[in-house]
UniProtKB/Swiss-Prot annotation:
The name this protein goes by in its record: UPF0246 protein BF4021
Origin superkingdom: Bacteria
Any Pfam family hit: H2O2_YaaD
Biological processes, Gene Ontology terms: response to hydroperoxide
Cross-referenced InterPro entries: YaaA (IPR005583)
GO cellular component terms given for this protein: cytosol
Organism of provenance: Bacteroides fragilis (strain YCH46)
Length: 257
C-alpha cells in the first residue's frame, strides 16, 4: 500500500530528528527550474500569486533568492513540512525501521518538487497549484507536473501492492492523470465526518488531524491490506461500513445526535 499526502504551506529548515539516510528528490532538476523561475518574481508579485500577506511574501522572496545557494539548509521532506497533518504523523519518534518503511510506502505532493519520498532532502519554499510559470507555455503547476509525474507515481504504487491510500486533498489529483491512476491501480480515499445537528459534516481541522493519524497508524503498524485499513480508530472515529464503498472508506465519530 502507498499513502499519498499533501504538502503543507508551513515549513522548517531545522530539526533535531536524525534519519537513517537521506535521498535526492526524483525531480530535483525540474524543481531547480521551477525555483529559478519563481525567483524572477518581485515581492509584490509573490504576494499576489501566492495569495499571502507582505510578511510571507518577503520570506518566500528570500527563500527563492537563496534556493540555489550552496549554504541553503535542507531537511528530509517528512521533517520539513510542519502543518497539522505532519504534526499528527509525528516522525520525531520514528525508529530507523519506521523511516525506511515510510520511504517505500509514503509519497508527498509538492508544487515545487513534484512528488517526494519522506527522506528526500528539500529546501523551504511556498507555491500554489494555480501559479503559472512563464516557461514553458505559461502553464499552471498542475499542467506542468501532470505529464512528468503520472507514470512514476503509478509505478511506485504497483511496487508496493497496487493499492493507493489517498489521504491528500482533492486538488492534488490535478498533479496526475487521475483517470489513468484509477484505471491502473486500486484507489481508496478515506473520509472523516462528524455528527453535527443530526447530520454528518466535514470539519477541516479534524480531517487534517485524522489524515495525519491514519498515516502514522499505517506506517507504524505496517498496514498492507485494505481490510487492515478499516481497523483504524482515533478520537472516536471508526470505520462506517454503511456509508463506505469500494473506493471511499468513511470514518465517523459514531455519535449520532
Amino acid at each position: 500500500m502507498l499513502i499519498l499526502l499533501s504538502c503543507a504551506k508551513t515549513m522548517s529548515d531545522v530539526s533535531k530528528t536524525k534519519t537513517p539516510l537521506t535521498t535526492f528528490p526524483g525531480f530535483r532538476k525540474e524543481a531547480a527550474e521551477v525555483a529559478l523561475q519563481m525567483s524572477q518574481f518581485s515581492v509584490e508579485e509573490l504576494e499576489r500569486l501566492l495569495k499571502v500577506n507582505p510578511k510571507i511574501a518577503v520570506e518566500n522572496y528570500r527563500r527563492y533568492q537563496a534556493f540555489h545557494s550552496e549554504g541553503t539548509r535542507e531537511l528530509p521532506a517528512l521533517l520539513a513540512y510542519t502543518g497539522i497533518v505532519f504534526k499528527r504523523v509525528h516522525p520525531q519518534d520514528f525508529s530507523e525501521e519506521d523511516f525506511c518503511y515510510a520511504q517505500d510506502h509514503l509519497r508527498l505532493t509538492s508544487f515545487c518538487y513534484g512528488v517526494l519520498r519522506p527522506l528526500d532532502m528539500i529546501r523551504p519554499y511556498r507555491l500554489e497549484g494555480d501559479v503559472r510559470l512563464p516557461e514553458p507555455g505559461n502553464r499552471t503547476m498542475f499542467d506542468y507536473w501532470k505529464p512528468i509525474l503520472t507514470d512514476r507515481f503509478i509505478a511506485d504504487i504497483k511496487k508496493v501492492g497496487g493499492v493507493l491510500c489517498n489521504l491528500a486533498s482533492d486538488e492534488m489529483r490535478g498533479l496526475f492523470d487521475w483517470k489513468r491512476v484509477e484505471k491502473e491501480v486500486r484507489v481508496i480515499t478515506p473520509e472523516f465526518h462528524v455528527w453535527k445537528n443530526g447530520k454528518l459534516a466535514t470539519v477541516v481541522v479534524y480531517t487534517k488531524m485524522s489524515r495525519g493519524e491514519m498515516t502514522r497508524y499505517i506506517l507504524k503498524n505496517r498496514i498492507e491490506s485494505v481490510e487492515q485499513l478499516k481497523t483504524f480508530a482515533w478520537e472516536g472515529f471508526e470505520f462506517n461500513e454503511q456509508l463506505s464503498d469500494e473506493t471511499k472508506y468513511v470514518f465517523t465519530n459514531g455519535k449520532t445526535e
